[in-house]
């Protein structure tokens, strides 16, 4: 999978921009606040349908403009894909794939797979479970639209149940209808997440051993809020969720929200048996996240048959020279986009192996 071309009109600080990319490595270099990350963001937007920096589309439109437009041409193994995103300050965004309008956001997923690594990803090990759930859900959604729609359904049912608990002080019999639906969707979420962690944990462990030269052992552990066994089938999991909901009803009613279920799941990272969040050094935390990101590349390749695009936003300065070298020289099969303020770490790459774009105030040389 390769992003061949990118076109921007009135996107962030770019009034009009047309770029063609190198099939392996593309480097956006320039001082801070010049627009490097905006380029990475626009590619990500064409993959996920939303920014990784803001939930407000208005912020993506050039100041004093009403619309913005993004177009990417993606070369895949069996076909070319054209993705268009039109942002409007007065209505929701319009999405097209090969000139066909998309009705649902989920229809965009899988047309352009990306793995993003930015300084914000350290939240995976530094902050609470919501960051780790977001990681799991984002990556699974790229390879399974069924999971994406099940997650959307679960969240809608959860909102209804919480409203009943909070505003109407619903009786248990009123809640039971929602419990059945919530448990059915939730059971599938647990199955998908469990399978995902099983696969990515093996890959992340291998990546981590390569990076640390087998000195450290990384474990990625799925920790569902509802306690299930490794071999529990979806029907068994559903019954366990229902039982939890019933047992927690009085607590839920008192708090006005649902206190158990997949929306409270977590993912634990351990190095040599110790929780990285609590006991890991800054370097170990970075390496654990890097290993996860590299594992994502292999997981997507295994699921869809080709590597996703790797987006590295201002992370080279976060890694030591050994990890920088490993990252740059072990991704020859993956098209990579890097934003950086200096070329020092990339100087030993041959000119024919990369393209360099100098970014200055929304202009590119």
Swiss-Prot record:
Keyword ATP-binding: yes
GO cellular component, one term: cytoplasm
Source superkingdom: Bacteria
Protein name: DNA replication and repair protein RecF
Subcellular location: Cytoplasm
Binding site for ATP: 30-37
GO molecular function, one term: ATP binding
Function per UniProt: The RecF protein is involved in DNA metabolism; it is required for DNA replication and normal SOS inducibility. RecF binds preferentially to single-stranded, linear DNA. It also seems to bind ATP.
PANTHER family, A to Z: DNA REPLICATION AND REPAIR PROTEIN RECF
One Pfam family matching this protein: SMC_N
SUPFAM superfamilies, per database record: P-loop containing nucleoside triphosphate hydrolases
Keywords noted in UniProt: ATP-binding, Cytoplasm, DNA damage, DNA repair, DNA replication, DNA-binding, Nucleotide-binding, SOS response
Primary localisation category: cytoplasm
GO biological process terms held by the UniProt record: DNA replication; DNA synthesis involved in DNA repair; double-strand break repair; SOS response
Family that this chain belongs to: Belongs to the RecF family.
RNA-binding in keyword set: no
């Amino acid at each position: 999978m390769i992003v061949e071309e990118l076109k921007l009109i009135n996107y962030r600080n770019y009034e009009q921009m047309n770029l063609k990319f190198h099939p392996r490595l593309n480097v956006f270099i320039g001082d801070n606040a010049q627009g490097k990350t905006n380029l990475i963001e626009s590619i990500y937007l064409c993959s996920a349908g939303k920014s990784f920096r803001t939930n407000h589309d208005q912020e993506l439109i050039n100041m004093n403009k009403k619309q913005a437009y993004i177009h990417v041409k993606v070369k895949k193994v069996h076909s070319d894909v054209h993705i268009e995103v039109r942002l409007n300050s007065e209505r929701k965004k319009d999405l097209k794939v090969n000139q066909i309008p998309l009705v649902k956001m989920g229809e965009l997923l899988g047309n352009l797979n990306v793995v993003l690594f930015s300084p914000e990803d350290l939240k995976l090990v530094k902050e609470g479970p919501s960051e780790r759930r977001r990681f799991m859900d984002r990556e699974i959604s790229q390879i399974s639209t069924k999971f994406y729609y099940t997650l959307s359904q679960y969240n809608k049912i959860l909102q209804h149940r919480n409203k009943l608990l909070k505003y109407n002080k619903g009786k248990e019999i009123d809640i039971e209808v929602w419990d059945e639906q919530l448990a059915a969707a939730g059971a599938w979420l647990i199955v998908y997440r469990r399978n995902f962690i099983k696969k990515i944990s093996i890959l992340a462990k291998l990546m981590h051993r390569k990076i640390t030269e087998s000195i450290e052992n990384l474990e990625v552990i799925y920790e569902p809020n509802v306690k299930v066994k490794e071999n529990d089938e979806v029907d068994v999991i559903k019954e366990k969720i229902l039982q939890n909901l019933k047992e927690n009803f009085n607590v839920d009613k008192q708090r006005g929200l649902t206190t158990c279920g997949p929306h409270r799941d977590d993912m634990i990272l351990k190095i040599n048996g110790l929780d990285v969040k609590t006991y890991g050094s800054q370097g170990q935390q970075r390496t654990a996240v890097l290993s996860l990101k590299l594992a994502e590349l292999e997981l997507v390749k295994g699921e869809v048959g080709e590597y996703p695009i790797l987006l590295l936003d201002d992370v080279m300065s976060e890694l030591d020279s050994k990890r920088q070298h490993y990252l740059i020289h072990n991704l020859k099969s993956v098209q990579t986009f890097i934003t950086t303020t200096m070329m020092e770490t990339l100087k030993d790459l041959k000119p024919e192996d990369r393209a360099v774009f100098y970014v200055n105030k929304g202009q590119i040389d």
